[in-house]
Each structure stands twice: as structure tokens, then as C-alpha cells.
Amino acid sequence: MARTCVVTGKGTTAGNNVSHSHKKNRRIWKVNVITKKIFLEDENRWVRVKISTRALRTLRKKGLKVAIKDHGGDITAITPKKYVGITPKAQPVATA
């Protein structure tokens, strides 16, 4: 999905708008995702990451490794530069 946070995995969700008279209309909620350059200290380089603003606050408070670990993610999912923003399931399998 294009509008998905790499750190938390949050994506677009669907549900109902409920009016005062309890009529239900379908709608979607989009995640506030921005593209941000983050410095990886272990590799001494910058990486572009699609991250939600909520995850960015957590990242600034705790740091990249701790924020990813807290949300059950894997740091290797964002490390390869050409796979930034792609979920681990969608990455091609390396053949040896």
C-alpha cells in the first residue's frame, strides 16, 4: 500500500460516518504519512522512510531502533535503500 507507515505498519482504514439520525455512510481514514530522511548511526548514512507523524514523535523520543522494536517491526525492513517503504513480505527473495 502506498499510504503505509514503515515503522508502525499503520495503513488506510475503513468504517462508517454515523449521522445524528444514525444513517451510516462508508468512508476511509487515511494515515498522515510523510517521507522523512532518517540517519542510521550503525551504517553512517541517511535513509528515506515513509513514516506516520505519530511514529515520528515516538522516534524522536525513543530513537529509531527502540521505536521499531516497540511496534514489532524489523530494522532490516528499512535498511536496504532500494526497499524503503516496501513491506518485508513484498521484498524479492535473493537467489544464491
UniProtKB/Swiss-Prot annotation:
Keyword terms of this UniProt record: Ribonucleoprotein, Ribosomal protein
Q: Name one GO biological process term.
A: translation
Do you know which SUPFAM superfamilies this protein is assigned to?
L28p-like
Q: Does the keyword Ribonucleoprotein apply?
A: yes
A GO MF term: structural constituent of ribosome
Cellular component terms per the entry's GO annotation: ribonucleoprotein complex; ribosome
Pfam families on file:
Ribosomal_L28
Record-stated family: Belongs to the bacterial ribosomal protein bL28 family.
Q: What is this protein called?
A: Large ribosomal subunit protein bL28
Q: Which organism is it from?
A: Leptospira biflexa serovar Patoc (strain Patoc 1 / ATCC 23582 / Paris)
> Which lineage do the record's taxonomy fields give for this organism?
Bacteria, Pseudomonadati, Spirochaetota, Spirochaetia, Leptospirales
